[in-house]
Every structure is written in structure tokens, then in C-alpha cells.
A protein has these predicted regions:
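Generic structural marker for isolated residues within well-ordered, non-membrane alpha-helices
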Residues: 127, 176, 260
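Conserved AMP-binding loop of ANL adenylate-forming enzymes
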Residues: 161-196, 201-204
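Active-site glycine/GP-rich loop and adjacent strand/helix microenvironment
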Residues: 1-63, 193-276
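Short glycine-enriched loops at secondary-structure junctions
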Residues: 124, 179-183, 231-233
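Nucleotide 5′-phosphate-binding alpha/beta core
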Residues: 1-129, 135-167, 225-227
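Short, well-ordered, mixed-charge alpha-helical segments that flank or form enzyme active sites
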Residues: 148-149, 181-187, 235-236
């Protein structure tokens, strides 16, 4: 039998009493949705310490789309050529980043293990399935640190829009919004957001006791951030909750200008397009 989210020390090794209490409160509310699955950050304390250092460093770095201005690229390429089976056959005499051959989904579908670095312990690998925009599912290997480092770039983008995650006051830091007949949902905490809650919710009525519970749940818990793809966020916009998050993060597919304009009018907060 799986542990309740507020007692899930396997997926959240550093879960403390305050984080546990937050999760129990959010899951046990009368208007709460169905939480069908479980998930967590899986980070050990030394990895959280390293993440904090990485985030502080990244915050002060300039962002550039020019390969020559990103000093991390050459060391990263060197590691790939040395330790990732797929890249070991690449021509190591290539000088420019732009001259390396690209890959596509067919490369990933043939042998995904060829993209796992030799030195990574297999018991820390996360495998997840994604269909992208093609509808053809792929199993992708990842690692808890990879998932966690997204937070550093999200924080940086939020700061560009004058949103400081260190000033969040709600016990619910982030809602990841979905809208599907069947959806992976869970309650977790985010150690890189002061151990505040992170909820993946499905706003399809199937996952709620009553459609009105969706509005009541958001207004009661007041999430600081809401993230989702343009489709799920559009569906969410039609729910008449009054709460205004500090920012909306749009992911996974192109955010059209007209849709962005609708979000800005509806939410009255920065809309961050993390995909287009």
C-alpha cells in the first residue's frame, strides 16, 4: 500500500512537519479534487544544496542565444563525447557547435539507453513517456537533478517580470493545470520553493466532486503560480474563480498572440511563454 502524500518520504526524502501538514490540508479539503497518482522531487540533501548554489549562480548570468557567449557549451559537449554512448562516435575534431549533426525522434526511439551517460547510477534514472506534438510516444530518461534545475530558469524568467519566488506567501506555490478525461495528478512539495506545495491537477469535471469545487478550491488556496499548456489554461480561464496568481507559465505548445491577450485580460499578471 502506498504512503499518503504527506507521509511519502521515498519520493520526498526531506519532507518536514510543515510540508507534511500543508499536503494533508490541501488533500483533505472538502472541495479537493481526486489525486490519482504520486510524485516527488527525489532529491537528497546534498543535491538540494547543489541546486541552491546552481540557482544563485544562474540568476547572475546573462542569457544569450549565441553559442559563443555560453561558456558552458564546450565543457558540456566534451562530457557528451566522452561519456554518452550515442555521441562517442561523433567526430571530435569538429570546432563549431553549429557543425555538429542534429538528432530527431527516430534516434531516440531506436535505443534510448544510448543517451544515458555511462557514469549515472541507473537507480536514479527517471523514465517518462511523452508524445510531443507528433502523437508518437517515446520513453525519455531523465534524472531528479535535471527536473529540479528547470526551477532555476523559471525563477530567472520570473525575476525578469518582477516576480520573486522568495516572496511567495501561499502554502500552495504552484498548480500544474491539466484538462483531460484522464490525467496524471498528484500532491507534492517543492523544496526549491520553500517547501510549499506543488499540485498537478486535472480541471476536467471528472476529477472533482462537483464542477463548482474547482472555483472554490482555487479561491481558497490561492496558488502563487499556475502553469499549463495553452489548451488547459484556456479551459481554466472559463472557471469563474476570483484569485489572481502572481504569474502564468505557458508550456508544451505554441502560445498564440490572441490566446496570450486573453490570458493577460483574464489573469491581470505576467504571462510567461516558456515554449514558443
Amino acid at each position: 500500500m502506498q504512503a499518503a502524500p504527506w507521509n511519502d518520504y521515498e519520493r520526498m526524502p526531506n519532507l518536514d512537519e510543515s510540508g507534511s501538514a500543508r499536503l494533508k490540508h490541501l488533500v483533505d479539503q472538502p472541495h479537493a479534487p481526486i489525486f490519482r497518482n504520486q510524485s516527488g522531487h527525489h532529491l537528497a540533501q546534498h543535491e538540494l544544496d547543489e541546486l541552491g548554489h546552481f540557482t544563485r549562480e544562474e540568476t547572475n548570468l546573462n542569457a544569450s542565444a549565441c553559442a559563443g557567449e555560453n561558456k558552458w557549451i564546450d565543457p558540456f559537449l566534451g562530457k557528451c563525447l566522452e561519456s554518452v554512448p550515442f555521441y562517442k562516435h561523433y567526430d571530435k575534431s569538429v570546432q563549431r557547435f553549429e557543425d555538429y549533426p542534429t538528432i530527431d525522434r527516430s534516434d531516440l526511439s531506436v535505443s534510448i539507453t544510448d543517451f544515458v551517460p555511462d557514469h549515472l547510477p541507473l537507480d536514479r534514472i527517471i523514465a517518462y513517456e511523452t508524445s510531443g506534438t507528433t502523437g508518437h510516444a517515446l520513453t525519455i530518461p531523465s534524472h531528479p537533478i535535471v527536473a529540479a534545475r528547470y526551477s532555476a530558469y523559471h525563477k530567472k524568467a520570473l525575476l525578469w517580470n518582477y516576480v520573486d519566488t522568495g516572496e511567495f506567501r501561499s502554502d500552495l506555490a504552484v498548480i500544474l493545470a491539466g484538462f483531460q478525461e484522464s490525467c496524471f495528478t498528484y500532491a507534492s512539495v517543492s523544496p526549491y520553493l520553500n517547501n510549499k506545495a506543488l499540485l498537478k491537477l486535472n480541471f476536467h469535471p471528472n476529477d472533482w466532486g462537483s464542477p463548482d469545487d474547482r472555483e472554490l478550491y482555487i479561491d481558497l488556496n490561492k496558488p502563487d503560480l499556475i502553469s499549463g499548456d495553452p489548451i488547459s489554461l484556456s479551459e481554466l480561464s472559463m472557471i469563474p474563480f476570483r484569485h489572481r496568481p502572481k504569474a502564468i507559465l505557458s508550456t508544451s505548445m505554441t502560445l498564440l498572440k490572441a490566446v496570450r491577450d486573453d490570458f493577460e485580460s483574464r489573469y491581470k499578471c505576467p504571462i510567461l511563454d516558456l515554449y514558443s
